[in-house]
A protein has these predicted regions:
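Helix N-cap and loop-to-helix transition residues
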Residues: 27-30, 99, 118, 137
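Acidic donor-binding loop of glycosyltransferase active sites
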Residues: 32-49
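Catalytic binding pocket for nucleotide-activated donors in carbohydrate/polymer assembly enzymes
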Residues: 44-127, 131-133, 151
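A structural signal for well-ordered alpha-helical segments within the folded catalytic domains
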Residues: 29, 36, 105-109, 139-143
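Nucleotide-activated donor-binding/catalytic signature segment of Leloir-type glycosyltransferases, i.e.
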Residues: 1-33, 92
Length: 159
C-alpha cells in the first residue's frame, strides 16, 4: 500500500501497544496532547457499540477514519445523511466480514488524500470534525438516556 516507513516517507506508521498516560517511554505525552498533535486518526473498527476514541479525535480537531461497524460511524452517517467523507471530518468506510483488504486500501488512500490536501482545506476539515463532535455533546444526547431510563423503570413497575 506504499506505507513503508522509509526515512524519506512523509507518513510513518507506528504501533504503540500501551495506554498513553504520559510515561509510556515512547511519546511521554498524555493521550489528549498526543491526540491533538495528529493530522488524522484511524480506527478500523470491526465492532464497537459506540467508540469514544473517534469522537475524542474530532473534539480535538483531529479528523478521523472509522467504519460503519462502529456505532459512532453509523451515527455520523445518519447525522450527515450520507457516508462520511474526509471533507466532512469523519471518513466512514463500509466494513463487513469479507472486505479487510478493501478497508485497508481505503484507509491508506484517505491518508494519501489528506497529505495532498492544501493547508486551507485541511483546516476546514479539522473544523468539520469539531462540528461533528459538537453534535454529540451531552446536551444533545441526555434526552435519550432519560428515555432509556424511563423505559426501564416502566418495564420494572409494569411487571
Amino acid at each position: 500500500m506504499g506505507l513503508e516507513n522509509r526515512p524519506e516517507d512523509r507518513v510513518k506508521v507506528i504501533l504503540v501497544p500501551c495506554y498513553l498516560e504520559g510515561n509510556d517511554g515512547i511519546f511521554n505525552l498524555p493521550y489528549y496532547h498526543l491526540l491533538a498533535a495528529n493530522d488524522l486518526a484511524l480506527y478500523p473498527s470491526y465492532y464497537e457499540p459506540w467508540g469514544y476514541t473517534p469522537l475524542e479525535s474530532c473534539a480535538f480537531h483531529t479528523p478521523c477514519v472509522t467504519t460503519d461497524l462502529s456505532g459512532f460511524g453509523q451515527w455520523v452517517d445518519g447525522v450527515l445523511g450520507h457516508e462520511g467523507t474526509l471533507e466532512d471530518g469523519v471518513r466512514v468506510i463500509h466494513r463487513d466480514d469479507s472486505n479487510y483488504m478493501q478497508v485497508a486500501q481505503e484507509m491508506c488512500q484517505t491518508v494519501k488524500d489528506l497529505l495532498n490536501t492544501p493547508s486551507k482545506q485541511r483546516t476546514a476539515i479539522r473544523n468539520h470534525a469539531v462540528s461533528i463532535a459538537n453534535k454529540a455533546q451531552w446536551k444533545h444526547f441526555i434526552k435519550y438516556y432519560f428515555e432509556a431510563y424511563n423505559f426501564a423503570l416502566s418495564r420494572v413497575y409494569n411487571k
